[in-house]
From Swiss-Prot:
Belongs to the ClpA/ClpB family. InterPro entries: AAA+_ATPase (IPR003593), ATPase_AAA_core (IPR003959), Chaperonin_ClpB (IPR017730), Clp_ATPase_C (IPR019489), Clp_N_dom_sf (IPR036628), Clp_R_dom (IPR004176), ClpA/B (IPR001270), ClpA/B_CS1 (IPR018368). SUPFAM superfamilies: Double Clp-N motif (SSF81923), P-loop containing nucleoside triphosphate hydrolases (SSF52540). It comes from Rickettsia prowazekii (strain Madrid E). Residues 6-71 are annotated as: Repeat 1. Keywords: ATP-binding, Chaperone, Coiled coil, Cytoplasm, Nucleotide-binding, Repeat, Stress response. ATP 1 binds at G207, A208, P209, G210, V211, G212, K213, T214. The gene is clpB. ATP 2 binds at G604, P605, T606, G607, V608, G609, K610, T611. This is Chaperone protein ClpB. GO terms for molecular function: ATP binding; ATP hydrolysis activity. Residues 765-858 are annotated as: C-terminal. Residues 3-147 form the Clp R domain.
Amino acid sequence: MNIDKFTAHAKSVIANHQSLAIKNDHQQILPLHLLSSLLSEETGIIQALINNIGGNINLLKDQVQLELNKIPKIQVDGGGQIYYSAEDLKVLEKSSSIAKDSGDSFVTIERIFEALTYDNTIAGKILTNNGINSKKLATAILHLRKGKKADTESAENNYDALKRYGRDVTELAENGKLDPIIGRDEEIRRAVQVLSRRMKNNPVLIGAPGVGKTAIIEGLAQRIFSKDVPETLINCRIIELDIGALIAGAQYRGEFEKRLKAVLSEIKESSGEIILFIDELHLLVGTGKVDGAMDASNLLKPMLARGELHCIGATTLDEYRKYIEKDAALARRFQPVYVGEPSVEDTISILRGIKEKYELHHAVRISDSAIVAAATLSNRYITDRYLPDKAIDLIDEACSRMKIELSSKPEELDELDRRIIQIKIELAALKKENDEHSKKKITSLTEELKKLESKSYDMNTKWQAEKSKLQQAQKLKEELEQARIDLERAERDANLAKASELKYGIIPEIMNKLQEAENMDNKGLLKEIVSESDIASIISRITGIPIDTMLSSERERLLVIEQKLCESVIGQDEAIKGVSDAVRRSRSGIQDINRPLGSFLFLGPTGVGKTELTKALAGFLFDDRNALLRIDMSEYMEKHSISRLIGAPPGYIGYDQGGVLTESVRRRPYQVILFDEVEKAHLDIFNIMLQILDEGRLTDSQGITVDFKNTIIVLTSNLGAEILVNQKEGEDTYKVRDEVMQYVRAVFKPEFLNRLDEIILFHRLNRNNIHDIVKIQLGSLKKILLQQNIILEFDESALNYLAEKGYDPSFGARPLKRLIQREIQNNLAKMILAGEISSGNTVKIRREKEELSINIID
């Protein structure tokens, strides 16, 4: 016996049976150990042989283990010597002899298994008693190998290669494990047309990720199963090639090629009845190419050209262009079938078709409004992915979320139980006290506890009943699904009696029971129907865009948005109204969906509230005044600085980092973008804004389209500020506007100005405005001091003093801020550090003659 003539798997079995004997403290290595090792081998070849003969591998394993337990254990200090029994060596010799007689160059595991049938010990008897003899086994091996000889050390890897390295899609269709395919008739028809050709009958499905390329293959498999295809394809089977399994473990040079050749050989022998489906077709180019070896695509080319291999590929347009088109010889052997993104209407039909599968899996119900919302909202708000994939993901996640909620305790009941635990803890603590107040408290808490426990018991009973009803409905859905699969099978096999029983008896009965089980009280504790609001909530979490159903409180808030913004911005009613209208349009869903929510050019002198209004708007929308992207346009005075906004071009440093503007909007699609002091930027920068303002999108340096449709864009400028500063009381507003617009038109191109929603003038602040701003500024200071437990008070004289001294029509409110810092904050800081003002003090500010006085009240 030459151990080198055994395959790698056979050597592994021999090593394992030796380890088994040592592990069990047996002195001899017996054929029984060899049989046990064979039954546990990982390739599945022995199991396939036993199943073919009609044996039961689990029964064999139990019998072998029973006999192994009977062998006496011998334990010797320091480790005893273990040796091969004569019978074991005889079996291995016999396996070599069988392999040689069969024309094999190497001894494989099935030859060792065959040799065991000639064994006269207990191992051979177990096989004989289970109906496994040498004659049956030889026939099964011949069927398994399909006439192939074991001529390599990895011969077992080439047996039944299609089953090992592929997935039978047609079999999945037969077992009802594929989702129904709605639409895509044209693409399936085109694929069938190419497959029916005499030569080069290999379609390649090309389309964006998520449009349903693999679904077309599943649809074709279902049509083959239902015989809804031309005669040439009726007996075909679609096998999906697993390239990962093909490559995995191919450690020796040439092993990958042998595996692939074994797959191709089986396909060739099938006489055109096997259609090979290769997902991610571009992976074939270069796969297996090491040190001059041929890659997978070169192995396929001859068979593809001769029409011996029916192959369907699937890849994206970018990868087809990058890998397949570069290899012209490979590209010409495939016929492209372009798969486009389905429309929203088609997506709704697809979702309705797969609805039952998701309801069955998640044990929930999906409303039709949820399906429509998933298609329309995903198309509108998730712009970097494709239909129907993104819509299906929304349905799946919404169902998953509801399933988790159904399996956990209802929130109302959970809060009740927590309150009961809290009361019990309080009672335990109060029982240690003897005073009268504690006794009264114990009495009141005990009464409350009784009421809550009674309520909890009732709710718990109701919850369990509802849960039981849902579980019953789920079981009925599973039975209904299985009955429908059985009906299809019965109709296909022409078993009319069974088909009639299922169609007119069993299925209607299950449906009636299911209808009764689903008639749950809408006011129950459990909600099992996925609605439109659930889909909107999922999109809000994914994108950050608040499109979930507005609460009545928010509706009221949006109607008074002007009042909220006026609390921060004084004297700019026209600007506030324009911005407020834009927000209301967006939140009510009636704005143009192909443009940003609003685009404004704020014109006015410094310090009148242009930037402040933008911050106030961000604060209103996000409850955070700093939740806006602020881009200071004075940093973009050079032409080349455009690359900072959209990313550096290929070949430059920072190409892979993205742009300041595009990356921010990609990560947070719903935000306020402030381009501050736009007149200072290079004029070429405004050219990239044209498509943002008009189409609501921008392509960055990497070719990724960024969606700006959910942003509010604000541009601020000081152009024409001199005119607005010198504007007299009661002067014609239209005349002033025309003069300012002359300055604006001299700087900005008409196509840029024409794309803005509104150009808003910020007028200079008057004394009354400054008086109101003083209140706001001191109010902010009051809040800061309150954090240190210091109360700040000021009278009307102090307000008038600050308004008079802080008023400068040319500089707006900014001098006022500096005045408050100089006159109040500096003095307060000194007094706090000196210990004159401490926590709990009240500080009163009033005017005394021509200055402010700060008085401390304990």
